Amino acid sequence: MCNMRNRYSLFLVLIIIFLSSLSTVCARTFEGSINFVRETVFDTTRINIYVKDSMVRVDERDTKNRLVSSHIVNLDKEEVYALSYSKELYKKLLVSSYSNDNGRISVKKTQNSKEINGHTCSQWRVRDERMNTEVAYWMCDGEFEFFSKLLNLLRRTEYSLAIFGAIPEVGGFIPMLTEERTLLRKEKLKIRIVDIEYNNPSSSLFGIPSHFKSVNRLS
């Protein structure tokens, strides 16, 4: 009887360990960097996103790879800071109450799929009659929960990632390729992910340099 109790206790311990490890794996979210290229008929720019825990940094660079804007986001605290490295200044952006403006757009999750950079992607088409645009998002399902939170937060500030703002609730998806066209099918812009790196970014990326001064406006 004692042996049976011991075996049963051991079995319970093993089950608990298994469930704990399973829950850790399931809760795991992306950490690392994601690099986008934004192409229009006029120029090509880059968007670099760094993720560590609940912190996100978004850098935008111009055609000559010069830093145009830099933002640090705390997803848990819902805080967004804009930084100017040339002026050594920073500003905390106002985050407004959530408002859902998706009533003006229609979303169709099509059956189309294709492989992009080794990832199988599904096509979501978002149509906005008022803006005379249709955007095709080739969405990759993964551990990118931060992306939905980031978009929902940024669209409530004066800064946004522009075309990504039209994406509805995306869960763990991220667009590997974004194609915007007019309703007459004329291409306006294209944004594609060129690199995804799983790593542990330095915490210094998500801090505001101590010598930067706080201001009400950066321009």
Labelled PLM ranges:
Residues 27-219:
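Extended soluble regions of mature proteins
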Residues 2-12:
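Bacterial N-terminal signal peptides that target proteins for export
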Residues 12-21:
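Bacterial N-terminal signal peptides
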